[in-house]
Amino acid sequence: MGRILIADDHDALRRGLARGLTEAGHEVDEASNGNAAIERLHEGHFDVVLSDLKMGGSDGLDVLRTARTLHPTTAVILMTAFGTVNTAVEAMKIGAFDYVQKPFEIEEMEVKIEKAIEMRRI
């Protein structure tokens, strides 16, 4: 299992996702906005970061750039309800591991996280 940071300004989604991933055996930390996520990245390493694209303060692309700089092996999965193809392409070019449209099922996210953790080990 892995150490995961969830950054999302929608409390219910963030807490529900954290609960599901904790029950699946992951160690989970939460950030309610992009600035808090960047602060957590400065404090330590995560195997996977799940970040909302649109948040107050720094956005998901800022979180992605910070993760790439501080922890190049950390997989970042961006989540959004309002994304476009151009945004997805930009995120992948910057180094996102994956890009997920909301709403999604927890099982879908668990598979993506496991794949990200496996890829880190190769």
List where the protein language model places each region:
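Active-site residues of response regulator receiver
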Residues: 8, 52, 80
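Short hydrophobic/Thr-rich beta-strand motif most characteristic of the beta2 strand and flanking loop
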Residues: 25-32, 40
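Short amphipathic alpha-helix used as the core "switch/output" element in two-component signaling
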Residues: 39, 61-72, 90
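Active-site beta3 strand of CheY-like receiver
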Residues: 45-50
